[in-house]
From Swiss-Prot:
Residues 379-400, 520-535 have a biased composition (Polar residues). Mixed-linked glucanase involved in the degradation of complex natural cellulosic substrates. This is Probable endo-1,3(4)-beta-glucanase NFIA_089530. It comes from Neosartorya fischeri (strain ATCC 1020 / DSM 3700 / CBS 544.65 / FGSC A1164 / JCM 1740 / NRRL 181 / WB 181) (Aspergillus fischerianus). The keyword Cell inner membrane does not apply. Gene3D superfamilies: 2.60.120.200.
């Protein structure tokens, strides 16, 4: 090797050593800062209540927060501590649901740091119980599990257990007061995990008789240490809120070895629970001198005991003064800000769709929007029960001429099931309810993808009123039409002659051929939940979208009877549009209109059908939202019946 290369290698090695030493010294010079803490009411408000089946197959019924509070299973004591107990009054059927209990979990996941739990009382040494304070990653066992406090039945010494995937050995010569009974944490050699049996008095009845105590866990990328301090032996640095682990003394568990802790133990959520029997307590029930009602089955004996002896579980409760999370160089304020920004769950998000006067508008969806200013001439979907109950007919009137780029705002309020439905029945000679010159579809031969209020295409399908039917349907990328009676964009089949465009209140040109009824069905767009835009798993708030999935529904046949003296032929069509709901689904509302064509006297004499047609926008709404669907259908039915009788009489 050349001298220069040798010098370079030695220099690199020295530099690397200096950097490592500097980093270690910097870390050692740091002190733990309080990042997060819980006490009293915050356990109820800031932790999740788990109310599903027990993953450990226990004879237990985990209850939700509301039930737990009402039944007194969780509460804040007069001293300000958090109480979490079990039902100790009900005698149960061993073949029925298990004993009611509580399991709570942190809402966020946590990594390396110092975790301190001050416990006044833990579930006592009782046959059939399995209490635990533990943590687990999102992907078990790959992300690891840390059982900080765990015991079953009559045990009086805590058991500390680590679980992870693959092979993770901690058989190093580590100084600890507990006893290492298994050094393999990985699932490659079974599900036992690496186990440290704590000292007597660290769990159950002796722990409670001594007035409780404090457990502290220091978790780094190279080791996990756990200390137990009886109430009378809590270090001064812990009591002062400035923990110094170097003064803690010998830990009860020191787990370190060839295992890569940074790789094997990822972010964890913390859990406090009390279950009964199950995979551990039930299977070792006979080993604890607990009563065996069924000598052939420790599990059944455990279930029988738990079901038939409610008073035995009065002391099976947790009373926790506090849990505190400390991290190097992280203050409580900055940690709270980071937690709020990265791990909090958004319960409701206001989403705005800004629309431009183009056929293909963009649909920005800002994350966690809390307020959206509304420009002039904006229709807004109400999101509260009160708003839906008090909608006025102003929301369903004909559309005024728009002068700017209007917007459609849709607010989603979590799991609300409220629904806004707008239905319009027009008895005048109206075919289409226009929006504006810049955003209306052509009445005859116009662009089928013209935007509705700037949002491309309300879901529309029209019955053909010409000899060559051409029903058109267009899709929209974001929000659908809101509950506005005249704000539906419709496309009518092209007729012979010059195409006509319907604007805000006038028809620019008149078709040169009469419409002829050729169909008795109308297609409507149906909403597909799969098309709804979704947020991520931790944030809600999305814009409901729908694609056209036409289905056919019958409509009355077009009347061929002459109206007003038999001089015209009337043909009807219905257009459907989807109205968004806060839940992300939509319902279809129909807009029915009559197109009337009147030939001249000369045309009638010659048999040549060349007359003129008139299309006018409706001037008012017959009925508005707020009526039940049944009332709406009744109004449509009566109006339609009167119209048919009138036409028949004239004929």
């Amino acid at each position: 090797m050349a001298p220069s290369s040798l010098f370079l290698s030695v220099g690199s090695l020295i530099a690397s050593s200096l950097v490592s030493a500097t980093a270690l010294e910097a870390r050692q010079s740091q002190t733990y800062q309080l990042a997060e803490s819980w006490q009293g009411e915050s356990f109820i408000n800031d932790w999740n209540f788990f109310d599903r089946a027990d993953p450990t197959n226990g004879y237990v019924t985990y209850v939700n927060q509301s039930f737990a509070e009402q039944s007194g299973l969780v509460k804040v004591t007069q001293s300000g501590s958090f109480y979490m107990g079990v039902d100790y009054e009900s005698t149960l059927n061993p073949n029925g649901p298990g004993r009611e209990s509580v399991r709570i979990e942190t809402k966020n996941y946590y990594t390396e740091g110092l975790y301190v739990i001050d416990i006044e009382h833990m579930p006592g040494s009782i046959c059939g119980t399995w209490p635990a304070f533990w943590s687990v990653g999102k992907d078990w066992p790959n992300d690891g599990e840390i059982d900080i406090i765990e015991g079953v039945n009559l045990q009086k010494a805590n058991k500390i257990v680590l679980h992870t995937s693959g092979s993770c050995d901690v058989s190093g010569s580590n100084d600890m007061t507990g006893t290492l009974s298994s050094s393999e944490c990985g699932e490659a050699s079974g599900t036992v995990g690496c186990v440290v049996k704590g000292t007597n008095g660290s769990s159950g009845d002796p722990f409670n008789e001594a007035g409780g105590g404090v457990y502290a866990m220091e978790w780094t990328d190279t080791f996990i240490k756990i200390w137990f301090f009886p109430r009378s032996q809590i270090p001064a640095s812990l009591s002062s809120g400035n923990p110094d682990t170097s003064s803690f003394g010998t830990p009860m568990a020191h787990l370190q070895g060839s295992c890569d802790f940074a790789e094997r133990f990822k972010a964890q959520k913390f859990i406090i629970d009390t279950t009964f029997c199950g995979d551990w307590a039930g299977n070792v029930f006979a080993e604890s001198t607990c009563p065996m009602s069924d000598p052939s089955s420790p599990m059944q004996s455990c279930v029988n005991y738990v079901a038939q002896n409610p008073a035995a579980f009065k002391e099976a409760y947790w009373e926790i003064n506090s849990i505190k999370v400390y991290q190097y160089g992280v203050s409580a304020a900055s940690s709270a800000a980071v937690s709020q920004a990265t791990a909090s769950k958004v319960e409701g998000t206001l989403v705005s769709v800004q629309a431009a006067n183009t056929a293909t508008p963009t649909v920005p969806v800002p994350a966690e929007t809390t307020a959206v200013p509304q420009p002039a001439q904006t229709n807004t979907v109400a999101t509260s029960a009160a708003d839906y109950a008090t909608q006025s007919s102003a929301e369903t009137t004909t559309v005024p001429a728009a002068t700017g780029a209007p917007s459609v705002s849709a607010a989603e309020g979590g799991d609300s099931e409220l629904e806004s439905t707008s239905t319009v029945y027009v008895t005048s000679t109206t075919t289409i309810c226009p929006v504006a010159e810049s955003s209306s579809a052509a009445a005859a031969g116009g662009k089928k993808d013209a935007p509705f209020n700037g949002v491309s295409g309300a879901e529309v399908a029209a019955t053909s009123v010409a000899a060559a039917p051409a029903a058109a349907t267009s899709e929209h990328p974001g929000a659908d039409a809101i509950a506005n009676s005249a704000a539906a964009t419709s496309t009518v089949a092209k007729s012979e002659g010059v195409a006509s465009q319907l604007t805000a209140g006038a028809l620019s040109e008149i078709p040169t051929a009469p419409p002829e009824p050729v169909s008795q069905a109308v297609s409507t767009g149906s909403f597909d939940d799969s098309d709804t835009a979704q947020g991520d798993s931790e944030e809600h708030g999305s814009i409901a979208s729908a694609s056209a999935a036409p289905s056919t529904i019958p409509v009355p046949a077009s009347s061929s009877a002459a109206a007003l003296g038999g001089s015209s032929i009337a043909s009807s069509f219905a257009s459907s549009r989807l109205v968004p709901r806060p839940t992300g689904s939509s319902t279809a509302a129909s807009v029915t209109a009559i197109a009337t064509w009147s030939p001249t006297a000369g045309e009638r004499a010659s048999g040549t059908a060349k007359g003129s047609a008139t299309l006018t926008a409706p001037s008012e709404v017959v009925f508005t939202p707020g009526l039940s669907n049944g009332a709406n259908r009744m109004s449509v039915g009566l109006s339609g019946l009167i119209g048919v009788m009138f036409i028949a009489a004239l004929a």
